[in-house]
Design a protein with these regions (language model features):
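A polyampholytic, Gly/Pro-enriched intrinsically disordered region
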Residues: 21, 100-107, 147-153, 245-261
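Gly/Thr-rich phosphate-binding beta-strand-loop-beta motif of the actin/hexokinase/Hsp70
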Residues: 93-125, 139
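Conserved phosphate-binding/catalytic loops in two-lobed NTP-binding clefts
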Residues: 221-247
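Short, charged, surface-exposed secondary-structure boundary motifs
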Residues: 91, 134-138, 236-243
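Nucleotide/phosphate-binding catalytic cleft detector across ATP-hydrolyzing
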Residues: 1-102, 161, 171-179, 196-201, ...
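Phosphate-binding glycine-rich/basic clefts of nucleotide- and phosphate-handling proteins
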Residues: 61-69, 86, 117-215
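Short, solvent-exposed amphipathic alpha-helical segments in soluble enzyme
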Residues: 72, 97, 220-226
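Short, acidic/turn-prone active-site loops that include or flank metal/cofactor-
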Residues: 85, 128-131, 231-237, 250
């Protein structure tokens, strides 16, 4: 009961001061019980003092409502919206049995998410306003081609493409553009990791997301960056599996958020309960 009270009190403080955000995940990183740290809550315990380290993952309320409204038009109610970058990182870390300091870099269209861990403890989650689309724009500007052509060149840069009759538009030039912007993204990620996670020096990075598909492990030597980098090949099945495994309790430290009020069932949900 005391644990529930502390979590609820912390949740109310977040909702009070971050009015434009919706709480997607609540993770308990540590239980400090009578000055002793526990990664998990002991089954039986008597104590005089208890303190929780709680990590909140929040999403903009406008974004949550946007997706809920899309499904609502088809009479489908959304019970939960999760942070895909967080869900994927938890799943891949578990599948690959990764330990120590590790950061997952999820490169999207216009944004890049960075989730850092130390073993099973999540240290930070940050979002940078830069992504794969910035590489496309760089190619478009320097090679003077439209965005559609730039996107095509970006995804086929390691093949023997004839860019144009212009001798300056060579494969080498294209690669330099892509690697330069990629190095910038990685450097910004490294700074974020150091400032938010207090990880000094080199740490392992795993790149994922649609924006990272232009690269793979054979290009690692061409990128000037000190950290150990791995490129993760993702499929739609991997992403969906990540969300499913998180929803059934993959992260044992995550708190299950229960709605205060009974939500009105949609048509298909009513049908499901009728035949259940």
């Amino acid at each position: 009961t005391n644990i529930q009270f502390l979590i609820q009190e912390a949740k109310q403080q977040i909702l009070k001061y971050y009015t434009n955000y919706n709480i997607a995940h609540i993770i308990i990183n540590n239980y400090k019980i009578d000055s002793v740290d526990y990664p998990y809550l002991p089954d039986e315990i008597m104590c005089d003092f208890i303190c929780l380290d709680i990590f909140f993952v929040c999403l903009p309320t406008d974004l949550v409502l946007y997706f809920k409204n899309i499904f609502s038009k088809s009479n489908i109610l959304v019970d939960q919206i999760i942070c895909s970058s967080y869900a994927k990182s938890i799943n891949y870390k578990d599948n690959l049995n990764l330990t120590g300091y590790i950061s997952f870099i999820d490169i999207g269209f216009n944004k890049t998410s960075i989730i850092s861990y130390y073993n099973d403890k999540i240290l930070s989650l940050d979002v940078l306003p830069i992504g794969g689309n910035h590489i496309t724009k760089d190619i478009s500007k320097i090679l003077e081609v439209n965005l559609e052509k730039s996107e095509q060149l970006k995804h086929n840069f390691d093949q023997n493409l004839k860019l144009s009759n212009d001798k300056d538009n060579s494969i080498e030039t294209l690669q330099k553009i892509i690697f330069a912007r990629t190095e910038e993204i990685l450097e910004l990620c490294a700074k974020s990791i150091e400032s938010n996670s207090f990880i000094l020096g080199k740490s392992r990075m795993v790149l994922m997301g649609a924006g990272s598909k232009i690269l793979d492990n054979k290009h690692k030597d061409k990128i000037s960056f000190p950290n150990d980098i791995d490129f993760l090949e993702e499929t739609t099945e991997n992403i969906c599996q990540s969300g499913f495994k998180l929803s059934i309790g993959l992260n044992k430290n995550e708190v299950v958020i229960v709605p205060k009020k009974q939500i009105k069932l949609g048509f298909f949900e009513k049908l499901f309960h009728f035949f259940k």
